[in-house]
Amino acid sequence: MPRSGPILSGRYNTMEVIYRYDGSFEGFLCCVFDSYVNKEIPWEFQDESHLAQSLFPVRWIGTDLRHAQRILVSLEKIDPWAKELVVKGFLTCAANKELLLYRFIRALYRVGKPLLRQLSDDALLPLLKAVRHLDGEVHLLKGFVRFSEFEGMLAGEIRPKNRVLPLLRHHFCSRMYNETFLLYDRTHHEALLHEPGKWAILPLEEFKMAAPSAAEAQYRRLWKRFYDTIEIKERHNPKLRRTHMPQRYWDTMTEFQDESYFLAGTEALPDNPLPLEQAHTPSPLPPSSPAVSG
């Protein structure tokens, strides 16, 4: 016997109507809830930042946390993995991710738990691919994030395709629980802020790293020199390196920056700078070093 969703299902018609919501995960779940209440399948979902004109009427769906919770509870009852797929799916960079999620949820309510074993199903496969891409990017960034120290605070930047900060939060907050740090997502203009005992992910339109201190610039040079030194020159393989360390991450990684990145704020770049491996060895390290560098 087919399952029904959180609202008793009846006949549904695909409507030429667009659901617009506030862009939050809870707001999207309220769109799902309202589609069952109204017994209609929306043509498209748009967040409130969408300004393009449409030929179809637009219906604003307000966010009601009680409605969102009912959807989440219904997914959890079917299978915890179903809930995880929906939560992660909303963080992906998949085109029309709301439609992917909506089709999956409707199919899940209709078929039930057996859908989760049908990995090639049209309602499940696109979502699985998107979530795998998200998980892969999270895994890579756990090793590719580079922090710098600024007056006792650590700061780093990333440029991911997916919204990864909610999934990176536990990794960095648990390993750096005594540190105050900021990790900025350039793509989605949000930042993970942490200080001992508390954290938050907040919108941040712009963020620019300050010029490094002399000590921080020195640590950057040392990290770059370490990276260059450990390579076995006879086994140099640029193609393999790009496979394991995709080039789109390089612009936020210390070891791939140009010469100006390794100068303190009071230093000037010479007209003909020497490569780092030929540069003068930096002065001895200060007695206290930052917990995370590079």
Identify the function of each model-found stretch.
Residues 85-89, 186-187, 235-242:
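Short coil/turn segments at secondary-structure boundaries
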Residues 27-38, 102-110, 170-174, 221-228:
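Short, hydrophobic/amphipathic alpha-helical patches that form generic packing surfaces
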Residues 1-13, 293:
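N-terminal amphipathic/basic-hydrophobic helices that include classical n-h-c signal peptides
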Residues 10-66:
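N-terminal ordered "arm"
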Residues 114-204:
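Internal, well-folded beta-alpha domain core
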